[in-house]
Structure formats: C-alpha cells, structure tokens
C-alpha cells in the first residue's frame, strides 16, 4: 500500500521534535482529515540550518513531515520556496490517491514557516 520510502520515514522519522532555539515555528492543520504538522527552523544568512517537525495524523502525513525536513535542511530560503507537492510525492516514492493531502500539508507548513521566517529576519 505504501512505498518503502513512506514506511522508512514513518518508522524512522528524521529531524523529529521541536527546535528550542527556532527563529520560526508554525502549526498547520488539514481541517478535512485532522492531520497536524508543526515545523520549527533556525535560519542564518538566508539558509535553513536546522529544521524539526512534529506530526499528528496518518502514516503519509508523518512521512511527508520527515521528508520535508530532509529536503530543506541546508537549503537557501529561495531553494526551499521552490519545493512543490509533486516533488515530495516523487521523492517519497508515490502516495495513494487518497493520501495526496499529506504532501500538500507539508508544502503548506513549509510556506507558512518560510513566511514567518522572513518576518522574523
């Protein structure tokens, strides 16, 4: 049902938890299914140095939360802003049709985080 990448990120989440010295912290919820994704990041010189996530929800939501942190860590804010839902779906090895919302939740949380980071710089 789920790709090996989804299961790996779910069973062995990367960058899980909260970043105590974060420059920005956001919480985004999908009202249709109740999934919640929180991101916190430390940005210096326009580059994302550290990022953490916490997720409450389905397996794909947790996996996409883990993956998005790997995708943006070390990237510039501009590079992170360019990440789209289809890139997440491809990198995670595909998602069932009914689980596409998980990749969108990750993108929405990332956009909110980057916006908040820009306001705090």
PLM feature spans:
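Short, thiol/selenol-centered motifs that function as redox-active sites or metal-ligating centers
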Residues: 33, 55-64, 102
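Short connector loops at helix/strand junctions that flank enzyme active sites
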Residues: 21, 34-36, 48, 63
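Alpha-helical support elements that line or immediately flank enzyme active sites
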Residues: 60, 64-75
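Short beta-strand elements
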Residues: 30, 35-45
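A generic alpha-helix surface/boundary motif
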Residues: 35, 62-66, 82-86
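C-terminal binding/interaction regions
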Residues: 1-20, 25-27, 49, 75-79, ...
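A short interface-forming secondary-structure element
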Residues: 42, 46-47, 51-61
